[in-house]
Amino acid sequence: MKNKNVQYLDNIKNSVNDLLDFYTDNHRKTLSIRFDVRYPQNYTGDTSSKNISDCMAHMVKKYKRRKCDPYYIWVREQNKSDHPHYHCLFLLDGTRVKTYNHVFKSVETIWNSTLDIDRDSKGLIDYCTNKSNRDYNGKMV
């Protein structure tokens, strides 16, 4: 019998694979963008999953207007910190968009707005990039 953590991770992996299979089956090109979303260190507001759901709903609305057929999945993680953080995968129609840096700027602005903090606050979105490999994120499939 598998332990609960392994079963949980298998469920997440299967959900991600199902989403990727669905999206790539329905689009000639898929742009996948990975990022992590955090709360400010001294944040005293609500830290429920409603915040990330609202943020991603705004992201979807923005990219639907651009006809990029956005889809996403996120996973909440909370280790020893007071606040959870989220691992996110955002998918866009690769025939409609070629680059991904605008996604980081958008999610930064929308997350700050969701938390009702300064729009220009930085450091809450981890771009999941690798300095030695500029093509580490924003994979086109």
Indicate residue ranges for each PLM-predicted region.
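Histidine-centered divalent-metal-coordination microenvironment in nucleic-acid enzymes
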Residues: 72-94
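A broad, low-specificity signal marking well-ordered, structured residues that form hydrophobic/aromatic
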Residues: 33, 72, 86, 113-115
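Signature for HUH/AEP ssDNA processing cores
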Residues: 18-79
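Short acidic, gly/pro-rich beta-turn/loop elements at beta-sheet edges
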Residues: 45-47, 84, 98
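Generic preference for flexible, low-structure residues
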Residues: 51, 88-90, 102-106
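Catalytic "initiation/cleavage/transfer" segments centered on a nucleophilic residue
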Residues: 1-31, 94-141
